[in-house]
Amino acid sequence: MSSKVYSTGSRAKDHQPSGPECLPLPEANAEAIDFLSSLHKEELQMLFFSETLAMVSDTGEPQGELTIEVQRGKYQEKLGMLTYCLFVHASSRGFLDKMLCGNSLLGYLSEKLELMEQHSQDFIKFLILPMERKMSLLKQDDQLAVTRSIKEGEEVKTGVTSFPWSSIKGFISEAANLVLLRVMAWRRMVPSNARFLTLDTEGKLCYLTYQNLGFQTIQVDHQQAEVFIVEQTVHAEEGIPMSCQYYLLSDGHLAKRIQVGSPGCCIITKMPILREEDEIEPRPVFEKKPLVWEEDMELYSKFLDRKEELRLGHASYLRQHPEAHALISDFLLFLLLRQPEDVVTFAAEFFGPFDPWRPSSPALGSSHRPNPFRSLEPEGDARSGAA
């Protein structure tokens, strides 16, 4: 398998223009930044739910399904500190012209939809040359690091770009876009003349806009429902703009999604129960009972109580960390699709990008394939041994 490393984003690393070929980076306007600043925690609480849509062709034939989930989660920062965040997981799988395709998205966001970390992956099983693309976005100190890899057949190309954090105010990642659409549906409005920032398909910084297309009544599961239509447009640096229309119910559920120029669409098949307010269940309270060590029945009863408490605690942990289920689900999906000979190495390569202590990729290419396993030696000992 051949491997290539390419460098992109020279404008991003040296963002001061030095000539006519080096243009300044685009900037979000005040309307976009003010809209993001207006978000508050109580509003976001109403947006925590999952949904599933069917992917259909222009003739109505089923092609696959799309799942979107937004939950409250926890994010481990570089120094090991845990902070609360918005966890976004989306995935789709289906067929495109009878060829298997799919994608997956994992994102961690702040309450102002600032990006903490995001990983995306999509593939198309072309008969002659299968293609797979991966992109990772990570906030590193005062930089946004973007790592892209494209695999066509056995050839892999990798590129790393960094943007100054101060230059991406108003940046909307793929994960943030899914949350922002729910906010617009809840408010029933789109910020007027707002111009956000995003990345195009080539990983270049560009403008992102939203347009209010008004209200429409559609039929969902034999029911009439009013939807709020928002058109999102990515103004790529090169090529024509890419637009997508979202038909949103009053609480943010997605009823329909249309990619402008694409023959198919995603539609909801069952009318959800529209949310009005979020009900937070109180945490279970377990009373401490005095333990009489002389009585075996009391000791056994205490054992059973403690066992139940641990079981509920484990279930509560999984509810608070939905990324655990999402990661395992994506891993099993790609394991079934790829069917690698070495499952252990495949698992190490899949979960490697989520390791906070994983060393960064070298800037220069190498003929040696990087080892996906973490060294058992501490970094300091390894250096001293090499010396």
Curated annotation (Swiss-Prot):
A single BP term in Gene Ontology: cilium organization
SUPFAM superfamilies associated with the record: Dimerization-anchoring domain of cAMP-dependent PK regulatory subunit
Pfam families in alphabetical order: CATIP_N
Source species, domain of life: Eukaryota
Polar residues bias: start-end ranges: 1-10
Keywords: Cell membrane, Cilium biogenesis/degradation, Cytoplasm, Cytoskeleton, Disease variant, Membrane, Nucleus
Chain segments carrying region Disordered: 1-21, 361-387
Tissues in which the protein is found: Strongly expressed in round and elongating spermatids, weakly in pachytene spermatocytes. Expressed in Leydig cells (at protein level). Expressed in testis, placenta, prostate and lung, and moderately in ovary and brain.
Main localization, broad class: nucleus
Location of the protein in the cell: Nucleus; Cytoplasm; Cell membrane; Cytoplasm, Cytoskeleton
InterPro entries associated with the record: CATIP_N, DD_CATIP
Gene Ontology CC terms, in alphabetical order: actin cytoskeleton; cytoplasm; nucleus; plasma membrane
Biased composition (Basic and acidic residues): 376-387
Pathology noted in the entry: Spermatogenic failure 54: An autosomal recessive male infertility disorder characterized by oligoteratoasthenozoospermia. Semen analysis shows markedly reduced sperm counts and severely reduced or absent sperm motility.
The family this protein is said to belong to: Belongs to the CATIP family.
Task of the protein: Plays a role in primary ciliogenesis by modulating actin polymerization.
Complex and partners: Interacts with TTC17.
Protein known as: Ciliogenesis-associated TTC17-interacting protein
Species whose genome carries this gene: Homo sapiens
